[in-house]
Structure formats: C-alpha cells, structure tokens
Design a protein with these regions (language model features):
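DNA-contacting surface of Y-family translesion DNA polymerases
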Residues: 1-91, 101-106, 116
C-alpha cells in the first residue's frame, strides 16, 4: 500500500535565492499534482524535504484538516513551510510529498447470489 506521493529534484548547482527556490517548488508542485491525479489520492499531510549543499537534510511537515490533491490547495502550505525552514545555506535538493491519504478509488463490491436449481 502506497504511503505517500511525492517528487524531488537534485540541482546541478546549488540554489541560494528564495526566488529560485520558489520557482523550483512551483515546478515540483505541478508534478506532484499530476502524480496525485494519476494515483487517485488525496492527502492531509504535506511534507517539504530540503537537502543543503553540505548534505544536511531536513523535513518539515504540516497536517491540515481537509484532504487535498490540487496545487492550489497545497502550494500555500509549501511556501509557508519554506519560510519556516529559515534557509541559511544553499540548497542542493528539494522535494514535496503528500501522505495521510483518503483513497479516491474505492470500489463498491457487488454481491451476486447464486441459486442451485
């Protein structure tokens, strides 16, 4: 059973400006939205992964009340998480994932009664 859906990117040159980081997070959020649509999942926990140039890694998560799978619903949270991360070093990798799912692909079982004549 899949526990999360996410995407990440390692950069060939480290990102230092918040503007560049937000541009890359926007691209990652677009990809994440596609993956959530394909997997037919909505989640309540948004996680931001940051790996710095020195390979130190942090993850920051927030769990919200509603299930989301659209960028418009989770990207503001991603931006808030990046602000809380206090970026003080150049960034080597960024990732976004969503977990704590509500499965949208629940199929009702059909029951059929067999009669032996």
């Amino acid at each position: 059973i899949q526990k999360s859906v996410g995407t990440e990117k390692t950069f060939s040159s480290d990102l230092s400006s918040v503007k560049d980081i937000l541009i890359e997070l926007n691209i990652l959020a677009n990809e994440l939205e596609k993956r959530l649509f394909i997997s037919k999942k909505k989640g309540k926990t948004i996680t931001l992964k940051i790996k710095y140039y020195d390979f130190k890694q942090i993850t920051i998560s927030r769990t919200i009340e509603q299930y989301v799978n659209k960028k418009v619903d989770f990207f503001l949270i991603v931006k808030d998480l990046i602000i809380k991360a206090s970026l003080i070093k150049p960034v080597r990798l960024l990732g976004i994932s969503i977990s704590n799912f509500k499965n949208l692909n629940i199929k009702q079982k059909k029951h059929q009664v067999d009669f032996n004549f």
